[in-house]
């Protein structure tokens, strides 16, 4: 509670909730998710809906509509940041998907490599190594599929 009180002091007294337009976040979220997942979008949403329709909606509205769609950073910047975060967490399938998404939004492989490598700067060498191994797998898969 002390931290919330302090936050209120710093953030100001703006108590007006401006609300949001669900339709805007939903359409922006679907657009962003389709950009990142490409032809795998329908399969992703279908898979998530199969066990939780609510989670599928949350994913689009909150994750891709609000978080990835908000001002401050571009979609490219956000997606490549997610690659770093997922590398730190060692979520292989998600790292791979977001590396692919990064490439789809025109982030170069060199930048993806640097972002993952930078985990070593925060003493996360094993996470960096893990993420780089997924990047290597991604590159090999793309070379072999051509």
Language model feature labels by segment:
Residues 1-75, 104, 117-146:
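Acidic, glycine/proline-rich low-complexity segments that act as flexible tails and inter-domain linkers
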Residues 57-60, 89-95:
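Short acidic alpha-helix initiation/capping motifs at coil-to-helix transition points
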Residues 71, 84-89, 102:
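Short, glycine/charged-rich beta-strand-loop motifs at protein surfaces that mediate ligand recognition
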Residues 77-86, 95, 115-116:
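Short, structured motif recognition centered on aromatic/hydrophobic residues
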Residues 87-91, 121-122:
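Short Gly/Pro-enriched loop/turn and capping motifs at secondary-structure junctions
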Residues 92-100, 105, 113:
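Short conserved catalytic/interaction loops centered on acidic-Pro-aromatic/His motifs
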């Amino acid at each position: 509670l002390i931290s919330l009180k302090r936050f209120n002091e710093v953030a100001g007294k703006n108590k007006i909730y401006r609300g949001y337009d669900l339709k805007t976040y939903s359409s922006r979220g679907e657009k962003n998710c389709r950009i990142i997942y490409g032809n795998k979008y329908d399969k992703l949403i279908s898979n998530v809906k199969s066990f939780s329709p609510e989670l599928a909606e949350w994913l689009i509205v909150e994750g891709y509509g609000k978080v990835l769609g908000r001002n401050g950073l571009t979609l490219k910047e956000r997606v490549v940041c997610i690659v770093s975060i997922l590398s730190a967490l060692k979520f292989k399938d998600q790292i791979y998907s977001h590396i692919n998404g990064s490439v789809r939004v025109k982030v170069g492989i060199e930048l993806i490599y640097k972002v993952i490598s930078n985990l070593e700067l925060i003493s996360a060498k094993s996470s960096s190594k893990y993420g780089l191994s997924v990047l290597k797998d991604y590159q090999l898969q793309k070379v072999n599929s051509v």
